[in-house]
Amino acid sequence: MEAGSRVIMQVLLLALVVQVTLSQHWSYGWLPGGKRSVGELEATIRMMGTGGVVSLPDEANAQIQERLRPYNIINDDSSHFDRKKRFPNN
C-alpha cells in the first residue's frame, strides 16, 4: 500500500509540474514575453501627464465632513471622562 500511495504522489507531482511549465500567463494588456502593446503604453503615459490630481465635488466634500463631525466632538470634549485607577490608594 505504501508503494501505491508513493506512485500516486509522484504522478500528481509530475502532473502539477507539467501543468505549470506548459501554461502561459496572460495578463490584461500584456503580450507574451511580458511586453506591453504600444497603444496601451501611450494611453498610460497620457493619463500620467494629467498630474493624477482628482478633485472631489463640493457636495462630496461636505458629506465627508458631516460624517467626521461626531468624532471631532468626542475628541475635543473628552475631559468629562474620568480615568479608572489601576491601583487603589493606600
Curated annotation (Swiss-Prot):
One of its GO terms (molecular function) is gonadotropin hormone-releasing hormone activity. The keyword Nucleotide-binding does not apply. InterPro entries: GnRH, Gonadoliberin. Expressed only in the terminal nerve nucleus of the telencephalon. The modification Pyrrolidone carboxylic acid is found at residue 24. Its main location: secreted. GO terms for cellular component: extracellular space. It is found in: Secreted. Belongs to the GnRH family. PANTHER family: GONADOLIBERIN, PROGONADOLIBERIN-2. This is Progonadoliberin-3.
